[in-house]
Amino acid sequence: MLSPKRTRFRKQHRGRMRGISYRGNRICFGKYALQALEPAWITSRQIEAGRRAMTRNVRRGGKTWVRIFPDKPVTLRAAETRMGSGKGNPEYWVAVVKPGRILYEMGGVAENIARKAISIAASKMPIRTQFIISG
């Protein structure tokens, strides 16, 4: 699963997801892509599940690119802990995704195979997505 090797700070504010994605919203590497239509936090487990589903479906053919990286730590408090006494410990990592962001790209395969593989990956995502073709 993806996570940063090291970060400057262990914990982050949650922040807000307003507006659309102005970067990472064009196809750069492959010919087909999966684009987010809603804002969400996508966990490293979800990213990995989608990647595995795509690569397993195309079977040695083509190449896939993961265009998002989980660089935000999400903290959780221990169960049955009283309020106060600081922020919880980082438990998992998420990628902040805004509408328009490209999640995965694929190349070197036929369109029908790419559409099938990307739709399987889309079912692993917690948001609505769309299949797009470059050009």
UniProtKB/Swiss-Prot annotation:
One Pfam match: Ribosomal_L16
Keyword Ribosomal protein belongs to the record: yes
GO cellular component terms, A-Z: chloroplast; mitochondrial large ribosomal subunit
Keyword Transit peptide: no
GO MF entries: rRNA binding; structural constituent of ribosome
Subcellular locations according to the entry: Plastid, Chloroplast
Gene Ontology biological-process entries: mitochondrial translation
InterPro entries xref list: Ribosomal_uL16, Ribosomal_uL16_bact-type, Ribosomal_uL16_CS, Ribosomal_uL16_dom, Ribosomal_uL16_sf
Keywords recorded for this protein, A-Z: Chloroplast, Plastid, Ribonucleoprotein, Ribosomal protein
Primary residence: plastid
Protein family membership: Belongs to the universal ribosomal protein uL16 family.
Subunit record text: Part of the 50S ribosomal subunit.
Name the record gives this protein: Large ribosomal subunit protein uL16c
Organism: Oenothera argillicola
